[in-house]
Amino acid sequence: MGSLTDNAAIPTVDISAFLDPNASQEARQDVVNAMSNACHVYGFFNLAGHGIPQETLREAFELNKMFFALPEESKKEVLISKSIGQSFRGYEPPGIQTHHKGLLPDIKETFMVGREVPLDDPDCGTFSTGPNLWPSSLPKEKFQDRIMAYQGSMLELVKNILAILAQGLPKEWGCSPTVFNSLLDKPSIPMRFLHYAPVPSQLEDVRQFGVADHTDFGCVSILLQEPGTSGLEVYYPPSDSWIPVPVIDDGFVINMGDMMQRYTGGYYRSARHRVLTNREKHRHSVAFFLNGNLGLKAKALDGSETETVVGDWIRGRLIDTMGQTGKLLQRESPKPVVLP
């Protein structure tokens, strides 16, 4: 059975019945209803019953810590400024992103990986498209190959989430169960390995956050939080309050982004959220973002005629919030390399 249970007001949706070919239609519909309601009301939910092995999740944190344990010179070897054109991948040091005037830059540091696109691809170097950057000190089979395997698992998971979300749209809209499939054609799928260092009490500042109040820019976000950590909060307008999002064992946090909100005419809500600083604990997480097909002209499914080009929207939001790094997205895209 699909379940929608209240966990500090953030629902938990178990999708195991939807993935089970032997489940009844009623059980599958329960999952659809639960996820649709969670995304309509909260824009966030905890995901259980996803079928991804526990060892895969533990390995993701191992890879996260492997990268951030590198010396600074090794991390800077793959600085995001060294990515080709506007492909926007690699290492972001702390203090890069500022979401609102009057706040200090986020303390997070990030290693970002996207869909692997070869140098001779005609789109190479355009926004969010190109080869990934890998630190030379980490063996390919121990780091790169395992990261790309995890990315593949996330892509399969988001396909299932989109299938459920499509069936949860209002029936009167007449949408096909495959209405979101066009998002998956050569998708932009940035994946961020995140580290938040502790902020000692003597350095605390009310303007400082791990990540300040923001919404995600794309369609669907899948966040893996490390057990034993805290800090993620979601803004809930009816009570004008911030709701903590607890870590559930072997689960994910799923949220809708701005692009999904625009695509569904506001039916699926992109909720504001933030990450607080911690005085003592390091926080590690892994976030997978489905931006979608960057060239897709996404016309609002509610018939409101609003149309958004996926890549233009997300690129614009990054330029607005990423400071000097955002200027990388205004570089001229290089001509594709012709390989022998």
Curated annotation (Swiss-Prot):
InterPro entries: DIOX_N (IPR026992), IPNS-like_FE2OG_OXY (IPR044861), IPNS-like_sf (IPR027443), Iron_ascorbate_oxido_reductase (IPR050231), Oxoglu/Fe-dep_dioxygenase_dom (IPR005123). Its cofactor is Fe(2+). The keyword Transmembrane helix does not apply. GO terms for biological process: small molecule biosynthetic process; terpenoid biosynthetic process. 2-oxoglutarate binds at R283. Gene3D superfamilies: B-lactam Antibiotic, Isopenicillin N Synthase, Chain. Pathway: Secondary metabolite biosynthesis; terpenoid biosynthesis. Residues 187-292 form the Fe2OG dioxygenase domain. SUPFAM superfamilies: Clavaminate synthase-like. This is 2-oxoglutarate-dependent dioxygenase asL3. The lineage of its organism: Eukaryota, Fungi, Dikarya, Ascomycota, Pezizomycotina.
